């Protein structure tokens, strides 16, 4: 059972692109890491532009976003859908309080330009069944997944 946060104390934000090799755009409060996919030859792990003291919420959002982006790719491949090169995932993880208890909650925005909204939504929801981070938090924290409107084609 999840509990609604009454007061947000801190928000960790990440932006992950489909390729993940180009890094994330710079922002005032975003953790900017170049991520790699395990098991791919020539895909060295690199941490670039690391902030001096990233918050745990930023690190969790970054790890989840990398994993979830990979899960989107796996689900799309199984559904024979080609993801656009400019696909992206934004995850925000809030640390907050309700009374004297601390909780986290998350928002996930998925952008798949050129993919029909219903197809993108089906891929995004199915990716939660693949991603270990999504499975770990399922039923434990509030998670809102949104497909951000883009110039998608009709279904």
Annotate each language-model stretch with its function.
Residues 1-155:
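Extended beta-strand/beta-hairpin segments
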């Amino acid at each position: 059972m999840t509990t609604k946060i009454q007061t947000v104390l801190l928000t960790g934000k990440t932006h992950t692109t489909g390729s993940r090799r180009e890094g994330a755009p710079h922002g005032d409060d975003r953790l900017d890491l170049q991520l790699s996919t395990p098991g791919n030859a020539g895909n060295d792990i690199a941490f670039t532009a690391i902030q001096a003291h990233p918050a745990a919420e930023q690190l969790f959002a970054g790890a989840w976003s990398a994993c979830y982006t990979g899960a989107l790719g796996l689900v799309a491949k199984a559904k024979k859908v080609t993801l656009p090169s400019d696909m992206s995932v934004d995850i925000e993880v809030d640390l907050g309080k309700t009374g004297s208890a601390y909780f986290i909650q998350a928002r996930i925005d998925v952008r798949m330009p050129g993919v029909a909204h219903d197809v993108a939504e089906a891929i995004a929801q199915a990716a939660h069944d693949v991603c270990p981070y999504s499975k770990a938090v399922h039923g434990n924290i509030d998670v809102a997944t949104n497909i951000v409107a883009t110039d998608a084609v009709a279904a």
